[in-house]
Amino acid sequence: MTRAIVVAVLALQAVTPAAKFDSGRAWEHLRQLVAIGPRPSGSPAIELTRKYIKDQLAAAGLAATEQTWEAQTPLDKVRMVSLVATIPGARKERIVFAGHYDTKLYRQFRFVGASDGGSSAAFLLELGRVLKARKNPLTIELLFLDGEEARMPDWHGTDNTYGSRHYVEAAKRDGSLATLKALVLIDMIGDRDLDIRRDTNSTPWLTNAIWDAAKRQNLDDYFLADSTRIEDDHLPFLAAGVPSVDIIDLDYEAWHTAKDTLDAVSARSLQVVGDVVLAALPHIETQLAKSMAPSGARLQRPRRYYAMNAKAQGRARRLKQAGH
């Protein structure tokens, strides 16, 4: 049965035209987002950001739904809103591509988060356009997360990852966690001097799928062999048992400074990550197919079980007939 799923996945991949990630489009999204200005959770600016994201998704033929909640932070209570857009596939099991669209709250300087908060949202918008035109064996979900950033100056305790924690808890409650098979998290990928290291918190096979794709694309100069430990929006998914990988460039000199502007990022970096993610996707789908039973199918017990069960039933009948 599993082999049949793998064959079906490969067949869909074979008839799908090559999907092209357009960094020019992604860059225009990034330019528009940065032009809004600082976009911290709960601000009027993040409302404008949500409208832009929803409008662009609609232009690509995708509808966005909102996950809204009140988050109690160490600083204040904030209304937060994550956006979800679904691209139906041949099966209901889904791969989630996620990234945050909020920027860190700073009052000392103007922080527009070109890479940190901007690049992930811009990337997901372009990825959505590409995957909408693709025949997807599994359902694809685009998740624009609010509340990744800490409200206090430092990342500490639960003052962070508000959106991802809320999403996972909601998925547990409504049962949709069962169909969530993998998370690919995109964060801070705009750096002109792009250096992405392996994350030791991420799921090894999923990490390998990304790094192997980078090597096949001759882009392994950007996806480095060394590793580091990263705390990010993938942690709640990992804690819930969802295979997850974080694609992030932490070696970014402009991180959490006023210099995180368009001057510090490049369309080339967006293109590199887009090419690698799209090259890795078929391999991720095939790997997941190997672990899944057919939709609606019952798992078959081994023949030996039926033979043993038949013997047991026969013995029970004989005992009953003998008056035992």
What are these regions (language model features)?
Residues 108-209, 226-229, 234:
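Acidic/histidine-rich catalytic neighborhood of metal-dependent amide-processing enzymes
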Residues 45, 68-70, 182, 189-306, ...:
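Active-site-adjacent substrate-binding region
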Residues 28-90:
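A non-catalytic alpha/beta surface segment that caps or lines the substrate-entry region
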Residues 33, 67-69, 87-89, 98-102, ...:
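Active-site-proximal beta-strand/loop segments in catalytic clefts of secreted hydrolases
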Residues 16-20, 34-47, 71-74, 107-118, ...:
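Second-shell loop/turn segments in exported
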Residues 30, 34-41, 57-64, 87, ...:
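Sec/Tat-exported extracytoplasmic proteins
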Residues 60-62, 91-95, 136-141, 178-182, ...:
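Loop/turn elements at helix/coil->beta-strand transitions in domains of secreted/extracellular proteins
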Residues 6-17:
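Hydrophobic h-region of N-terminal signal peptides that target proteins for export
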